[in-house]
Amino acid sequence: MKKSFIHQQEEISFVKNTFTQYLIAKLDVVEVQGPILSRVGDGMQDNLSGTENPVSVNVLKIPNATFEVVHSLAKWKRHTLARFGFNEGEGLVVNMKALRPDEDSLDQTHSVYVDQWDWEKVIPDGKRNLAYLKEAVETIYKVIRLTELAVEARYDIEAVLPKKITFIHTEELVAKYPDLTPKERENAITKEFGAVFLIGIGGVLPDGKPHDGRAPDYDDWTTETENGYHGLNGDILVWNGQLGSAFELSSMGIRVDEEALKRQVEMTGDQDRLAFDWHKSLLNGLFPLTIGGGIGQSRMVMFLLRKQHIGEVQTSVWPQEVRDSYDNIL
């Protein structure tokens, strides 16, 4: 039992370390330290889809402030790039750990504990467009494939990912599968191509509903791009043969500029956020134009090691029935 546990931990470390090294080299970012707490009221917390309640923390020696455990570092990263004067084409990556206790499903792929490679880069002049987003997606997908090949060589786990990732807009997807739910659309398109970047998540589609929810103040999901489609963000999805479904590895996008921020908070009714320090800084032109995202660490390990449950590669909390159903939960 001990031997199996140690081997399991060595596999997890190998995937994480290998991916980290490739990501830093190929994406050309520096690894930095990030926070676990965010001060309430400065606007730095990631509100995700807007319905999740963060974990509140009171610090004894700072009685005049309340803090929250971060959901992600989407806004903190952009603030940090500005604070330390990162130039065009430069960026950072953080080994982020977060808690999302309002996760509506604790299942094979969802956990209260979230670990990500959280990255952000300053966009070069004239590159705030769909083509640059696709370049970044292809770079990250290359890192995923290189890591998969390294796992194949070390552990004899057959590589399954296609050489190229397929791009498709959410508007195209709803037209292609009008009678399917968003999740069913993801399953259909990802099973067909093996690896997909789904562009434009957050805005209302022709069927009157968004593909999925997104906060209005980090990703730009409203800017018109090509053929009347909208959105400069999206998700990297791969086909998970173990689960028989699409499997999200990363959410990423070009971040809002001043106009996109104002447009999106008006659409979601979140204009009150513009009073926060972070949002004021953006509106006053103090932040660079950036692109960034989060890549799930435990999800990546789970996929590349062909595990059935995310609890096999991370230590978290689970209902007893989940522990009873899976022998290898950590």
Swiss-Prot record:
Indicate where this protein resides in the cell.
Cytoplasm
InterPro entries the record matches:
aa-tRNA-synth_II, aa-tRNA-synth_II/BPL/LPL, AsnA
Name of the protein described by the UniProt record: Aspartate--ammonia ligase
Annotated organism of origin: Streptococcus pyogenes serotype M49 (strain NZ131)
One Gene Ontology cellular component term attached to this UniProt record is: cytosol
Gene that encodes it:
asnA
What broad class of enzyme is this? ligase
Domain of life, per lineage:
Bacteria
What stretch or stretches form a coiled coil here? none
In Pfam terms, one family for this protein is AsnA
Q: Can the keyword ATP-binding be found in this entry's annotation?
A: yes
